[in-house]
């Protein structure tokens, strides 16, 4: 019996699930909107809500707890400055999940998870590795 067992397994191991939610949370805080499957989006929402609540607390212990989960200095800085400031007057409900049809390849239900009152300019910002490696080496 599954009494009191919460959360989906998503057909991956627990370490894979933890890493996946870490990466998805980093992407969501960085870009403020991501597209994923509906079950993953529904499971990601409480993870991100708790991180934003840590950001609103703003003390050193909260920052260390957020870094332990996210492991990305730039994203933790954004979380504790811009994102926390935006939601200081809101008591929860920082993200929303919108259904986005089905995926062409396997007919999986897709969803868009985004931060409420998001910064539209953040979408696509700093996504992926830099293409101009030669220019970077010349500068160094």
Swiss-Prot record:
Keyword check for Ribosomal protein: yes
SUPFAM superfamilies: Prokaryotic ribosomal protein L17 (SSF64263)
A matching Pfam family: Ribosomal_L17
GO biological process annotation, one example: translation
PANTHER family in UniProt: LARGE RIBOSOMAL SUBUNIT PROTEIN BL17M, RIBOSOMAL PROTEIN L17
Assembly with partners or alone: Part of the 50S ribosomal subunit. Contacts protein L32.
The protein, known as: Large ribosomal subunit protein bL17
Species of provenance: Gluconobacter oxydans (strain 621H) (Gluconobacter suboxydans)
Lineage, broadest ranks: Bacteria, Pseudomonadati, Pseudomonadota, Alphaproteobacteria, Acetobacterales
